[in-house]
A protein has these predicted regions:
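Residue(s) in the substrate-gating loop at a strand-loop-helix junction
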Residues: 152
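Conserved glycine-rich cofactor-binding loop
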Residues: 18, 25-26
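Alpha-helical segment proximal to the catalytic Tyr-Lys
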Residues: 136, 181-185, 243
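Short, small/polar-rich loop/turn modules that mediate ligand/substrate recognition or access, typified
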Residues: 97, 184, 189, 245-247
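Active-site helix of classical SDR
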Residues: 131, 168, 176
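Short C-terminal tail/terminal secondary-structure segment
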Residues: 2-10, 157, 235, 246-260
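Substrate-binding pocket helix/loop in short-chain dehydrogenase/reductase
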Residues: 107-108, 115-120, 203, 215
């Protein structure tokens, strides 16, 4: 019998794949960039903070990984088009990971139109414009591709004070379903990955607070996730292992959405 490690390695191998990742400068995006590069992909890292990504790129390249850095504000349509065009000039994109996102928690009565628009444009309209730009190119050349929308369990359930965030993440999940119906037969798959609560440098202090501890008690696993515990699902969705999976949402949350 063949070595199972060889079989699994080939199944999930991202070597030769070109993947555009947004929100790559911090939080889960920073971790995702390393993960995809370690799995063999050439990662087109896009975010507003070029300096942070430049430092990350040095680390990835020091490990033998392949990556490029692109300045991108996902609220800017023209910047999106320019970013996708620049990445495509390097090589056709095999996958898009829509990871950029913001929260802006507010009580409903205190939520301004500007805050709502900022969250919506970052978390839903930006991913849509990015997906559309990539889809146009893949339909033109007939290549298959995978679009992975990083959603949230807050697109499935709610905790309050996050109306635009929850609405946008729910929209992101259903955007994938609708695009699947239109694009599946043409070799384009669109799925969502909905993390629960994961510890990053962006939220570690809050998750360690009394309020964070109360939230932890609601997770059946009785702990928060570690970024590396998203690696399997992310690589799966970007790889050929998920070629017949489309319009779905994978939750990785320690059982959070299964609880009351």
């Amino acid at each position: 019998m063949a070595d199972p490690r060889t079989f699994l390695g080939a199944l999930f191998d991202l070597s030769g794949k070109h993947i555009l990742l947004t929100g790559a400068s911090s939080g889960l995006g920073r971790h995702f960039a390393r993960t995809l590069a370690r799995a063999g992909a050439r990662v087109a890292m896009a975010a507003r903070s070029v300096e942070k990504m430049a430092a990350l790129a040095q680390e990835i390249r020091a490990e033998g990984g392949l990556c490029d850095v692109y300045a991108l504000d996902v609220r800017d349509r023209e910047a999106i088009r320019a970013c996708v065009a620049a990445a495509e000039a390097v090589a056709p994109l095999d996958a898009l990971v829509n990871n950029a996102g913001i929260a802006r928690p507010r009580a409903p009565e205190k939520l301004s139109d500007e805050a709502w628009d900022e969250v919506y444009e970052t978390n839903l309209r930006g991913p849509w414009v990015l997906a559309q730009e990539v889809v146009k190119r893949r339909l033109a050349d007939g290549r298959e591709c995978s679009i992975v929308n990083i959603a949230s369990i807050l697109g499935i359930r709610a905790i309050g004070h996050l109306a635009p965030y929850s609405a946008a993440k729910a929209g992101l999940i259903n955007l994938g379903r609708d695009l699947c119906v239109d694009l599946a037969e043409r070799g384009i798959r669109v799925n969502a990955l909905a993390p629960g609560y994961f510890i990053t440098e962006m939220n570690d202090e809050w998750l360690a607070s009394p309020a964070g501890d109360r939230l932890r008690q609601r997770v059946p696993a009785k702990r928060f996730g570690k970024p590396e515990e998203l690696d399997g699902a992310l690589v799966f969705l970007c790889s050929d292992a998920s070629r017949f999976m489309n319009g779905n949402c994978i939750t990785v949350d320690g059982g959070h959405t299964a609880g009351v």
